[in-house]
Regions:
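Ordered, amphipathic secondary-structure segments that act as subunit-interaction surfaces
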Residues: 80-91, 96
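Short secondary-structure junctions
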Residues: 76-83, 214
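Helix-start/capping segments and mature chain N-termini
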Residues: 1-73, 90, 98-250
Length: 250
């Protein structure tokens, strides 16, 4: 079952057909930072997308060399020097029905500009709890409604982002970033099994600490651990590392 790359054709913007599984939420994406017209950590994004696609049964038949070539071609075509590129993989067109499967997945690349935010982040706690057993939280799926609602709530009360907790009241992640805290010169971050997306920057930071014999632990964290921490920060592929200023104004 192949993967079809939908490319620009003249002035026409590539799009998914109305019968595509993506309109039922069956799709994945990767957001890749572009520096000096080069995609950052392209292999890690390709690898994660492939692993996630296999979990969902979405065909992802594209080699890393082809993936990288498509990224470069799109970046060059859009004259992007600094910015981002989004790769969206859909389940493909299929017959009507929740359990139906597309036979040919579809992949679109979109470039965009963005600004790096340098100010510290003000967080709020979201008042509903996540089920850590829900497999969706470990996938970068196109189903972002929960994050949209949460971030709008945060902005409405003057915060920057929202922090989720699971049904055991353990910290998970924000709407778009992984969380770390520092306590007694030890770096801590929530476990993937607590219901988080295994972020690319998160993985790089953990690997960097391990390579340089710096103490880093993946454990379940409570809100009090955040409040008592020496420092708290967030990571994601576009913004890098951002310090957390407060959680619920504390």
């Amino acid at each position: 079952m192949p993967t079809r790359v939908i490319e620009d054709k003249g002035d026409m913007t590539p799009s998914f057909g109305i019968d595509d599984r993506i309109f039922l939420g069956e799709g994945l994406f990767e957001t890749i930072r572009v520096n000096s017209s080069k995609p950052s950590f392209a292999y890690m994004h390709w690898e994660r997308l492939g692993n996630s696609a296999r979990q969902l049964g979405i065909p992802f038949e594209i080699s890393f060399d082809d993936w990288f070539e498509h990224l470069i071609q799109k970046i060059q075509k859009d004259n992007l020097y600094h910015g981002g590129i989004k790769a969206i993989l859909s389940g493909g067109p299929a017959s009507r029905g929740l359990a139906e499967r597309g036979q040919v997945s579809q992949l679109i690349f979109q470039t965009f500009n963005y600004s790096i935010q340098k100010h510290p982040v003000r967080l709020i706690s979201i008042n509903w709890l996540r089920d850590k057993a829900n497999p969706l939280y470990q996938l970068k799926s196109v189903n972002y409604l929960e994050a949209i609602i949460a971030q709008r709530q945060a902005i409405a009360v003057g915060a920057d982002d929202a922090l989720f907790f699971n049904t055991e009241n353990h910290v998970t992640e924000t709407t778009c970033a992984n969380l770390f805290l520092i306590e007694n010169n030890i770096l801590y971050t929530p476990r993937v099994d607590d219901g988080i997306l295994p972020g690319i920057t998160r993985a790089r930071l953990i690997s960097h600490c391990q390579q340089h014999k710096m103490s880093v632990q993946e454990i379940s964290l409570t809100k009090k651990r955040i409040e008592d921490a020496d420092a708290v920060f967030l990571t994601n592929s576009l913004q890098g590392i951002r310090r957390v200023l407060s959680l619920d104004n504390i």
